[in-house]
Swiss-Prot record:
Mg(2+) 2 binds at D91, D94, D221. It is an enzyme of class 3 (hydrolase). It comes from Mesembryanthemum crystallinum (Common ice plant). It comes from the Eukaryota. This is Inositol monophosphatase. Its EC number is 3.1.3.25. It catalyses: a myo-inositol phosphate + H2O = myo-inositol + phosphate. GO terms for biological process: inositol biosynthetic process; phosphatidylinositol phosphate biosynthetic process; signal transduction. GO terms for molecular function: inositol monophosphate 1-phosphatase activity; metal ion binding. Substrate binds at E71, L93, D94, G95, T96, G194, S195, C196, E213, D221.
Amino acid sequence: MAANVPLSDFLATAVDAAKRAGEVIRKGFYVKKNVEHKGQVDLVTETDKSCEDIIFNCLKQQYPNHKFIGEETTAAYGATELTDEPTWIVDPLDGTTNFVHGFPFVCVSIGLTIGKVPTVGVVYNPIMNELFTGVRRQGAFLNGVPIHVSSKDELVNCLLVTEVGTKRDKSTVDATTNRINGLLFKVRSIRMAGSCALDLCGIACGRADLMYENGYGGAWDVTAGIVIVEEAGGVIFDPSGKDFDITVTRIAASNPLIKDSFVEAFKQAE
């Protein structure tokens, strides 16, 4: 079916779904939330669940034969294997902790893989009214305006974004803080804003120069952002310098000029 449908049609459907879910997020942002715990610091709200339903219903109406992977359905029913079939991979509310605290760095993330390749990406922050889109070989955009990664070529001039994840065992926390400590001597500054998808979009539009995350939640965190970064001229890779593998939950992104320097700095900080 994917071979007979223009990618622009997939994009339009994803944008529609993201905006519908985004309206629910926007309305829920300013009211008291009913919060559940998936882990010590990993939260989920009724908004996460209702937004996933909205998105999947919208997508399934148009593409009933496609496959679907979502953060909340995966948490409830277990992982779904990624195949070569057209597959929609959805995080209905990336940045749930931010949402709960009223910090406006939240988004809907909708990605489509075809042949396991991220092909269409939509990331929508309804609080800041920013819509990032990308289609393979067709460019990346913020609210319809073309975007491009930065041109920084020295680490000392770079802004690095990362996340600390949700694991709080001592070995993970020590490794995370030691790594950040080492990298902080190499770059201009470091930011942690609480949304992997929006971190990737920050690389795509040049707000930040480097991004990495060890142990992100799942493919729903990165699929859409990968398309947007690559279409904005950026590169996606494993922080070790190896090729990116979506099943390993390690990701890095940058402009092509700074990748090698970052990989070397990352190895030294490990």
